[in-house]
Regions:
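Short, glycine-/Ser/Thr-/acidic-enriched flexible segments
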Residues: 47, 106, 157, 183-184
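Adenine-nucleotide phosphate-binding core of ATP-dependent small-molecule kinases
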Residues: 90-145
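Acidic-glycine-rich active-site phosphate/pyrophosphate-binding loop
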Residues: 41-52, 161-171
């Protein structure tokens, strides 16, 4: 849920600040939560000032969510008569993203398939990584490129495959620090 993710982001930001010997309120950060949904938030001097609405599928596509979709085509689908409102909501958030393309949200299983030569899985997972990197790059513009650090968190942050490829695309923006896991209960 988005409230828990926001709490997790603040907790991770405070932990990072403490590790750096500074205060959260003195930092400008991009925090990317990599889970069933992918949220990217800009934290400026102790306040979250911008974020995508990952719960409704905005931003990069993820294991369960479609990500930002072309509005015109979405309108066509909505009025096609093929789907109910609930069916469409499930197709955008829950049965979308990696699930729609590869039939699973299991990132380690997808990576294993890639290692065994599955080119489709590699293409889809690399597309997700590309979309995450692009969104993080866009978030950097909110801070005029003056980003103290990029913090990566969530269950997918355990994946060396994803983190290493993400770092290749975004390391020029700011130092990257990885805090794998959800950590949402500790944040409460």
């Amino acid at each position: 849920n988005s409230t828990a993710t926001a709490l997790n982001q603040k907790a991770i930001a405070r932990r990072f600040a403490k590790e750096q010997g500074t205060k959260y309120e003195e930092l400008d950060l991009i925090i990317c939560h990599l889970g069933g949904g992918i949220s990217i938030a800009v934290h400026q001097h102790g306040k979250a000032i911008d974020a995508n609405n990952a719960l409704d599928g905005e931003g990069p596509f993820s294991p369960e969510r479609a990500g930002t979709l072309p509005a015109g085509q979405l309108i066509d689908i909505c009025y096609s008569g093929q789907f109910t409102k609930d069916e469409l909501k499930k197709r955008i958030s829950g049965r979308a993203g990696l699930t729609a393309h590869l039939g699973t949200t299991d990132v380690p299983a997808i990576i294993k398939a890639i290692e065994e030569g599955d080119k489709k899985a590699e293409l889809i997972l690399d597309a997700m990584i590309y979309n995450v990197a692009k969104a993080i790059g866009g978030a950097a513009t909110v801070l005029y490129g003056k980003v103290d650090a990029i913090l990566l968190t969530g269950g997918i942050a355990y994946s060396d495959y994803i983190i290493s490829r993400l770092k290749k695309r975004i390391s020029f923006l700011a130092p990257i620090h990885v805090y794998p896991g959800e950590g949402e209960m500790e944040s409460l």
